[in-house]
Amino acid sequence: MTLESIMACCLSEEAKEARRINDEIERQLRRDKRDARRELKLLLLGTGESGKSTFIKQMRIIHGSGYSDEDKRGFTKLVYQNIFTAMQAMIRAMDTLKIPYKYEHNKAHAQLVREVDVEKVSAFENPYVDAIKSLWNDPGIQECYDRRREYQLSDSTKYYLNDLDRVADPSYLPTQQDVLRVRVPTTGIIEYPFDLQSVIFRMVDVGGQRSERRKWIHCFENVTSIMFLVALSEYDQVLVESDNENRMEESKALFRTIITYPWFQNSSVILFLNKKDLLEEKIMYSHLVDYFPEYDGPQRDAQAAREFILKMFVDLNPDSDKIIYSHFTCATDTENIRFVFAAVKDTILQLNLKEYNLV
């Protein structure tokens, strides 16, 4: 074999290798492009305590790995802290609302619980268990609980305080429902990616309190869908940050802002009217018309109330071509969220994947 033919052979091998590398790069670029299409970004928005974090927990239960016993154990301290936080809020409100304790001994119990530094709570033992039990059974505290719209109290208060014996058991392990009910204000941004039908859904939860909202802005690129949560039960409540502003008015103002943002022009909007279970309870004694005088429907009618609230939000949409998809939800009810999210997923996939022939 001559030198020339050996060189030609080597060259063609090199050329082949170069072409192979080039083809591989092209293939990878095509793959990346396709994968980018297959990742859908869902932005969870809504005011503080509307249920966004609970919704993410449900995605982990329904479409992810769920919560192992070890994971659940990690919530034990938070459950204890939620109980102390709730009782302290009611003890403070007893003073503010000038409600007396029915039983004299509960004043000492209140003092004991009031002095606890909640951040440092890591156990739930006596004398605190008995003190909190005794306080919860005091008619004064029960009256204070009934007036909770006048101050800030977690929605999970009754759930935990009605189950103190179980939580106080030394072998207590939080249940899935306990995990769903734990309240930890979201600071910063939480992302939860999960895989469905070879499509990655990346759900992004941002803090709802006003101080957290300035951090949202960089989440707004390439958003497939806005999922906006409203707590139906907030029609008679005031804001954490400002006690003379109605929470639902704040939620409406935020929704109006979000749906008119120019960078959401191509994002679908899904409205979750959440906490429908709490609305059903509350509507029996707290009348919608007292807070929204334009309501002219029947009193004590949860169905009429929620339809009115839905219409209030849908009417904020200035673009008649843009459909707002809506669902009534209870974020702590796994079966309800499983059912609702199946419908939402179909909506999102149909709207966004038709053009890529992936459905």
UniProtKB/Swiss-Prot annotation:
Annotated region (G5 motif), positions in chain: 329-334
Disulfide bonds: none
Region ranges (G2 motif): 178-186
Domain of life: Eukaryota
Residue span(s) of domain G-alpha: 38-359
Gene Ontology MF terms in the entry: alkylglycerophosphoethanolamine phosphodiesterase activity; enzyme regulator activity; G protein activity; G protein-coupled receptor binding; G-protein beta/gamma-subunit complex binding; GTP binding; GTPase activity; metal ion binding
Binding site for GTP: S50, G51, K52, S53, T54, S156, L180, R181, R183, N274, K275, D277, A331
Keywords of the record: Cell membrane, Golgi apparatus, GTP-binding, Hydrolase, Lipoprotein, Magnesium, Membrane, Metal-binding, Nucleotide-binding, Nucleus, Palmitate, Transducer
Protein's name according to its UniProt entry: Guanine nucleotide-binding protein G(q) subunit alpha
Lineage: Eukaryota, Metazoa, Chordata, Craniata, Vertebrata
